[in-house]
């Protein structure tokens, strides 16, 4: 995807990341509100089964988050050697979307756990995932850090400038 400016680049990246983030968040909020008003009944009633779902879904989410983090770290290291800033940013764009998709999948497991068990633990775990998401958000500062930008390239991306000077 080609961008006419760095401002447009981050504008489009943010919009896509917001959409990816808001979809599971909307589902989670809907399920949580239904649970609070008593319209959502737990599909799993036995305490032992609830514990199994809590441990299982938390472990799956942690595995997804860890895998996404390690894979993205390796991919981003590879694109640091690409000579053109535009090409690096294009790769970073797609990798950032993939990172957000992975985090959305992990948060969807928390919504699934809430739906199955009505356990408040999944609300806490969802909040932890949202905090992790905020730390992984593809901001200009994060892009500079991930891509190891220095000098003029760093200034252009960090301050969303289209030209030097």
Mark where each language-model region is:
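Alpha-helical transmembrane segments of integral membrane proteins, especially early/N-terminal helices
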Residues: 11-33, 161
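Select subsegments of transmembrane alpha-helices in polytopic membrane proteins
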Residues: 15-23, 94-103
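Membrane-interface helix termini and inter-helical loops of multi-pass transporters
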Residues: 35-46
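Alpha-helical transmembrane segments
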Residues: 47-65
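Membrane-helix interface/capping segments
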Residues: 65-88
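Alpha-helical transmembrane segments and their membrane-interface junctions
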Residues: 102-123
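Alpha-helical transmembrane segments and their immediate juxtamembrane interface regions
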Residues: 126-162
């Amino acid at each position: 995807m080609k961008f006419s400016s760095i401002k447009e680049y981050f504008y489009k990246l943010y919009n896509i990341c917001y959409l990816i983030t808001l979809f599971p968040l909307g589902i989670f909020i809907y399920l949580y509100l239904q649970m609070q008003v008593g319209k959502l009944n737990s599909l799993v009633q036995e305490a032992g089964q609830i514990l199994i779902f809590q441990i299982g879904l938390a472990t799956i989410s942690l595995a997804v988050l860890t895998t996404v983090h390690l894979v993205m770290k390796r991919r981003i290291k590879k694109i640091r050697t690409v000579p053109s800033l535009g090409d690096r940013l294009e790769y970073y764009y797609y990798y950032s979307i993939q990172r957000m998709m992975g985090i959305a999948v992990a948060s969807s497991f928390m919504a699934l756990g809430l739906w199955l068990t009505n356990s408040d633990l999944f609300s806490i775990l969802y909040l932890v995932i949202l905090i992790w998401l905020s730390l992984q958000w593809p901001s200009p500062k994060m892009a500079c850090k991930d891509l190891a930008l220095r000098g003029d390239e760093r200034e252009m991306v960090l301050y969303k400038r289209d030209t030097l000077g």
